[in-house]
């Protein structure tokens, strides 16, 4: 009722009373968080209080019909994308509530925004940048409110749910972009082109003293100059947090072996389904902020607020230089590059020992689950010395296409829609006669045993090989020489971890649709053996060396079917092609 009253005052009697800019969280001593109606009220209230410095707007609508609210704040007066570009101001996107149960970012963001506007925090910083604040990304999930949505989290009393109303995890959706909410977010990103994106979370895990983790890319991946900037940005924010009493970490604190502190930690680069794995591919800065769920809600909100303010201070000081480096990275990514492109990353075998602020613990078999369980004593801090592998190197690399990719007409419409979501350049082609291309054929394939985000995934191995094909009118040419060339490869390279192929978009091309009956194959096999001594030798060798093959009638007949003229030569052939020169 109080929120409704506030909204009525805001919309009908603005001259009589200024609406409060405090949150339910603040008023409750940070024991509670407000419902989404509060976000709607506060969004308009900030704009009403600071009409020349704040604008409230909708950037999308959720599947359940709720508005997706954003606030843009800058004391420069640049409150739309065109004005920000004209003034040359860096844009910072701060995103809360992608997992709506981890809602620290909403309340911390409103707190930081108010203090920034009132000059209590980072005075003058909003003159030199534009802050784009999305309090709650997963709006429908936020309204699935319950006290039991995060049983391993200390506060608030009630909170939202991890996934959307369609049960999609938005923090697995940046590249495949299937959720309507993600499509709206990408449109927002394309419009504003933020230099830096800050994704606010609260992590699960073991019990330890460290209260927050700050992870940044580019750091191990991406443009070399931006990698240097990424480390500078991360280290500066961590230093600010430490000065304010936090115990920040520069890596995600998940044990190598679940629930075993002695196993230590491994660092890496997240795939582009995640925010920090996505934005470096756009030549922009991404920061993942993870407060620790075992910390109380007041502690988590405070450390998140401190992070947001530190980010704003760093962008105010360095944003112009960093923005220039990002533009230069766009140019560099558009140039020919003879070096192999990394698709995945992993830590090498190099190990070092680090100090980690944990608690005394025991590991004993559980009489409930039967598993070995770790129990922590939070009254007894303990300095652990644990292994850390953080020498992160490319794991899977592939040669870059000479010019780009060709998407045949039968797949053009839906691939084009995906390319547009990521603001990628492509061209529709007329019919093409015999054209030199590279084609990828899988030598091994593995379908996911269970669905992931509603899809059956596919992992393939294979090689690109030269081939001549004809393409009908309407095929797409996606050039590699464009600023977001890394995103092009992430989507269209078949072995990339979040490619369209990996997410099951082309599974039907890897399913056998035609076959040879066993009684036919028996006779065909005998004819082939009689005509081809080399084939007979190969068959007998396989029988002698492969016991599983020898024991399988189906495998033995398939040996001959695959070598027969009736075999489907298009099976296991990836329909997207590579091309070495511009086909236009």
Question: Model features per residue range: what roles?
Answer:
Residues 18-584:
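Structured catalytic-domain cores with a bias toward divalent-metal coordination
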Residues 12-14:
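N-terminal signal peptide c-region/cleavage motif recognized by signal peptidases
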Residues 1-9:
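Sec-dependent signal peptide recognition
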């Amino acid at each position: 009722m109080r929120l409704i009253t506030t909204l009525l005052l805001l919309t009908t009697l603005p001259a009589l009373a200024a609406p409060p800019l405090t949150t339910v969280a603040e008023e409750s001593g940070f024991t509670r968080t407000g419902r989404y109606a509060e976000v709607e009220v506060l969004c308009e209230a900030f704009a009403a209080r600071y009409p020349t410095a704040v604008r409230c707007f909708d950037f999308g609508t959720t599947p359940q019909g709720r508005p997706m609210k954003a606030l843009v704040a800058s004391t420069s007066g640049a409150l739309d994308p065109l004005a920000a570009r004209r003034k040359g101001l860096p844009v910072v996107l701060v995103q809360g509530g992608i997992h709506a149960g981890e809602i620290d970012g909403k309340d911390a963001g409103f707190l930081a925004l108010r203090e920034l506007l009132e000059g209590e925090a980072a005075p003058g910083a909003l003159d030199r940048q534009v802050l784009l604040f999305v309090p709650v990304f997963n709006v429908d999930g936020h309204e699935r409110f319950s006290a039991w949505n995060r049983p391993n989290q200390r506060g608030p009393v009630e909170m939202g749910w991890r996934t959307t109303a369609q049960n999609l995890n938005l923090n697995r959706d940046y590249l495949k972009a299937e959720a309507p909410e993600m499509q709206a977010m990408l449109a927002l990103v394309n419009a504003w082109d933020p230099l830096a994106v800050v994704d606010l979370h609260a992590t699960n895990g073991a019990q330890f003293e460290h209260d927050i983790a700050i992870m940044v890319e580019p750091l191990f991946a991406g443009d070399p100059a931006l990698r240097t900037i990424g480390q500078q940005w991360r280290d500066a924010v961590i230093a600010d947090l430490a000065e304010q009493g936090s115990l920040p970490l520069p890596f995600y604190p998940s044990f190598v072996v679940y629930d075993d502190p002695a196993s230590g930690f491994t660092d890496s680069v997240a795939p582009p389904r995640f925010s920090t794995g996505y934005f470096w591919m756009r030549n922009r800065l991404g920061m993942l902020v993870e407060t620790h769920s075992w910390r109380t809600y007041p502690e988590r909100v405070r450390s998140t607020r401190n992070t947001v303010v530190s980010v704003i201070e760093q962008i105010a000081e360095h944003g112009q230089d960093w923005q220039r480096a990002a533009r230069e990275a766009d140019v560099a990514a558009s140039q020919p590059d003879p070096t192999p492109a990394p698709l995945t990353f992993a830590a090498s075998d190099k190990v070092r020992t680090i100090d980690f602020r944990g608690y005394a613990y025991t590991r004993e078999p559980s009489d409930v689950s039967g598993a070995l369980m770790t129990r922590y004593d939070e009254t007894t801090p303990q300095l652990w010395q644990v292994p850390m592998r953080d020498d992160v190197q490319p794991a899977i690399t592939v040669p870059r296409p000479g010019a780009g990719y060709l998407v045949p007409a039968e797949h053009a419409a839906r691939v084009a829609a995906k390319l547009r979501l990521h603001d990628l350049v492509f061209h529709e082609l007329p019919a093409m006669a015999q054209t030199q291309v590279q084609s990828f054929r899988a030598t091994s394939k593995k379908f996911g045993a269970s669905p992931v985000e509603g899809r059956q995934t596919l992992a393939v191995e294979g090689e690109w090989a030269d081939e001549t094909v004809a393409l009908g009118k309407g095929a797409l040419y996606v050039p590699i020489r464009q600023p977001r060339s890394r995103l092009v490869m992430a989507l269209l390279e078949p072995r990339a971890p979040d490619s369209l192929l990996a997410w099951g978009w082309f599974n039907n091309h890897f399913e056998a649709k035609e076959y040879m009956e066993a009684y036919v194959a028996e006779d065909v096999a005998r004819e082939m053996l009689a005509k081809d001594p080399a084939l007979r030798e190969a068959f007998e060798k396989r029988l002698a060396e492969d016991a599983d093959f020898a024991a399988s009638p189906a495998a033995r007949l398939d040996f001959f079917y695959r070598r027969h003229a009736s075999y489907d030569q298009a099976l296991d052939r990836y329909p997207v092609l590579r091309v070495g020169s511009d086909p236009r």
